[in-house]
Amino acid sequence: MIAPIFAELAKTVGADKDGLPTLVAK
């Protein structure tokens, strides 16, 4: 359930797999 949400978030910020960790760190 959370995976799709994070995927959409990453898309919104234009981030990729590498951007995900950065988003979480924020």
UniProtKB/Swiss-Prot annotation:
Q: What is this protein called?
A: Thioredoxin H-type
GO CC aspect terms: cytoplasm
Q: Which domain of life is it from?
A: Eukaryota
Is Electron transport there in the keyword field?
yes
The answer, when asked if Mitochondrion is one of the entry's keywords, is: no
What this chain does, per the entry, is described as:
Participates in various redox reactions through the reversible oxidation of the active center dithiol to a disulfide. The H form is known to activate a number of cytosolic enzymes.
UniProt family annotation = Belongs to the thioredoxin family. Plant H-type subfamily.
Q: Which UniProt keywords apply?
A: Cytoplasm, Electron transport, Redox-active center, Transport
Where is the protein situated, by its record's location annotation?
Cytoplasm
